[in-house]
Amino acid sequence: MPNPSCTSSPGPLPEEIRNLLADVETFVADTLKGENLSKKAKEKRESLIKKIKDVKSVYLQEFQDKGDAEDGDEYDDPFAGPADTISLASERYDKDDDGPSDGNQFPPIAAQDLPFVIKAGYLEKRRKDHSFLGFEWQKRWCALSKTVFYYYGSDKDKQQKGEFAIDGYDVRMNNTLRKDGKKDCCFEICAPDKRIYQFTAASPKDAEEWVQQLKFILQDLGSDVIPEDDEERGELYDDVDHPAAVSSPQRSQPIDDEIYEELPEEEEDTASVKMDEQGKGSRDSVHHTSGDKSTDYANFYQGLWDCTGALSDELSFKRGDVIYILSKEYNRYGWWVGEMKGAIGLVPKAYLMEMYDI
């Protein structure tokens, strides 16, 4: 190996070697960072990191020149300054150039301790300053917790590499970020006068799921009601949300009035009880008006967060549990009637999200 103390580059470094070096360092310094390694594996990891730094010290000038050529105006570098030492470059790499761009500060939190995680998974995040080592994308474990987007080196990290509040942002697919086979897996989160966050998912479907989840929360932040509620889908659930309208036609039929008017006084109470039973039966029938469960995808929901029922008629469920909605007759109170694993009870609609995008 060339002498690490050498300050000049012995020759141009092939692009294939640059890419290989970038991938190896990402894996060794970042991916393995959150893994539970044996003592021998940790020593080997540290040795590889040192060797990579030695190689970079030899080709430092070339990396710097390459970075200047690739640096564009699309991103601002908050860590601008002299990069004449490996320690400074390493520090920038370790921090993932992920300082908050809008001045917001969030306390450190372990990935496993995030509350109310709506969606999480591994994504490739585009570096804000991707000149260092000449590569752009880094694998990150990302999580949408309430209205804050966190990203970590892995799902075992004790502290996030960065985060930002999504309020005020917009999200969209963008197939112009890459030219390889993953171009249809890219999306970006952007806002005027704010930093652009760009990601690559494992598949186009996964990218679309991230976009839909983010849009759901952003739409909720911009309104006083939960998106996809009754105003948007009222025609589908009119017969469910207004049970009185279901039973009222039975009471208004002339033949019913004639029958009960002719009953003797002592039998009116019995007739009234029968009417109440009929009304109750009509309301109960609402639970089964949605159709065949095997194809009724619109009424399948999943838990956004853990929920423990306070009363015996309330269902308890965990985040991700599948719940089939039988009725929305208590929608005005924020409750629906759901079924999970054979149990039926009330569920708070704010704790649910649609399972299928129809």
UniProtKB/Swiss-Prot annotation:
One of its GO terms (biological process) is B cell activation. The modification Phosphotyrosine is found at Y75, Y151, Y197, Y260. Belongs to the SKAP family. The gene is Skap2. May be involved in B-cell and macrophage adhesion processes. In B-cells, may act by coupling the B-cell receptor (BCR) to integrin activation. May play a role in src signaling pathway. Residues 232-292 are annotated as: Disordered. Residues 255-270 have a biased composition (Acidic residues). It comes from the Eukaryota. The modification Phosphoserine is found at S5, S9, S87, S90, S223, S272, S282, S285. The SH3 domain interacts with FYB1 and PTK2B. Dephosphorylated on Tyr-75 by PTPN22. Phosphorylated by FYN on Tyr-260. In case of infection with Y.pseudotuberculosis, dephosphorylated by bacterial phosphatase yopH. This is Src kinase-associated phosphoprotein 2. Keywords: B-cell activation, Cytoplasm, Phosphoprotein, SH3 domain.
